[in-house]
Amino acid sequence: MKSPSILVLSWVLVAALLLCCAGIAAAQQTAAPASAAPSRDAQSGAPATLPVLRLTLEDALARARKNSAQFQSSQTDAAIARQDRYQAAAALLPSVTYNNEALYTQLDRSGNVRLIANNAAQEYISQANVHESIDLVSISAFRRSSAASALAKARAEIASRGLVVTVVQSYYAVAAAQQKLEAAKKNGEEGDRFLKLTQDLEKGGEVAHSDVIKAELQMQDRRRQLLEAQLGLLNARLDFAVLIFSDFNDNFELAEDLHASVPLPTIAEVQQRAARDNPDLRAALAAVQQAGHDVTGARGGYLPSLSFDYWYGIDAPQFAVNGSNGSNLGSSAVATVNIPIWNWGATQSRVKQAELRRTQAQRELSLAQRRLVAEIQSLYAEADTALNELSGLSRSAELSAEGLRLTTLRYKGGEATVLEVVDAQTTFAQANAAYQDGAVRYRVALANLQTLTGVLTTP
């Protein structure tokens, strides 16, 4: 039989062991979140990768319009003109007002009559009034505001013309810079290969050291051209980003191919559509219509005007529907015809003034028509020339690439000189750059032509 002291000591040891195990477990649980916290912090601190924004030309134009203060100003003017038209239309419709008045008149106890228009010492008026006025001036004002709204809309499209051409040129300049960078990389690789080739041939005693020097100079020139192409692409992307993004963003790519086949419409199609949708022509025509309505409105000053008023409510000594002698409610109606007689020639002056404006608007319309015909021929010739040259430039780029390959092979066989290879490399670089510039020229010329027909200027 164990002694009581041994039993007590055993229980103390067991309790101590349990306490130690519990402390270790608690320490492990505390350390686990602490070790997990830096992981979460690291994950939260890592910047999220935004998806690359693919931009079509229409997307770029829409974004540029939102960021252009000049275009937004013209849009605001067009919106204001639409509200003017709404207000002019509302002026032709009956209006309803509700009048409330309280009048106090001091009575004359001597019997003299004064303030005869007042009906009693205390008079209360609470009436609804329906008013309608009809005259030629108001009708002409509505028609004028309609023409002014069309004029403001056309001017908004005119304001966007320069913006459209700028965006198109910047958009395809980025595409051309990308193509030039790819060509510069190929030229750089070709320069490195040619330098390696001349070095190998020099070791074999087949060429002189001067060929190696010439190849190395050419290689250094190609590397400088590669750096310039990288800088050109960077500047083109920055200029384009400033133009279309409200907050600077360089994380984008172009969705349209610079060398995609875009047919040129016939000149008859361009002329037909320009006659119908050209913003300058529509603006000039709307200005003539507006001036014509001004003349009609000014001549309306010679004619009578008609107004009609209808009242319903109370006009009584008590502010109540029912008075001491019955109902205070009543109604009345008034029709008025105002006939102009004499105003010292002011109406004649306004008519003359409006006719002068109409004559000037007609002159500007004739000028816009002649200018449109000239611009169509000029811009169409520009686009047609650029398109015809583009096929030749494409062929030149292909031939220069093939010529470079063949010249390099001839140099390997000892049939060509190093100068011929260098000349072939230079020709290839120039032909490729000219091809990219020609593609941009055609796109810009086509955009200029499309602005005449309202294709790209209409949001």
Regions picked out by a protein language model, each given a short descriptive name:
Residues 62-72, 79-95, 128-144, 154-161, ...:
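A glycine-/polar-enriched beta->alpha junction
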Residues 90, 221-248, 397-455:
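Short segments within alpha-helical structural elements
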Residues 2, 13-19, 26-35, 49, ...:
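Acidic, low-complexity, intrinsically disordered peripheral segments
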Residues 27-101, 107, 254-289, 340-341, ...:
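Bacterial Sec-pathway N-terminal export signals of envelope proteins
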Residues 123-125, 169, 214, 330-332, ...:
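Transmembrane beta-barrel architecture of outer-membrane proteins
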Residues 42-53, 99-134, 253-267, 296, ...:
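Small/polar, glycine/serine/threonine/aspartate-rich low-complexity segments that form flexible
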Residues 2-3, 162-275, 382, 386, ...:
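Periplasmic alpha-helical coiled-coil/stalk elements that build and connect Gram-negative outer-membrane
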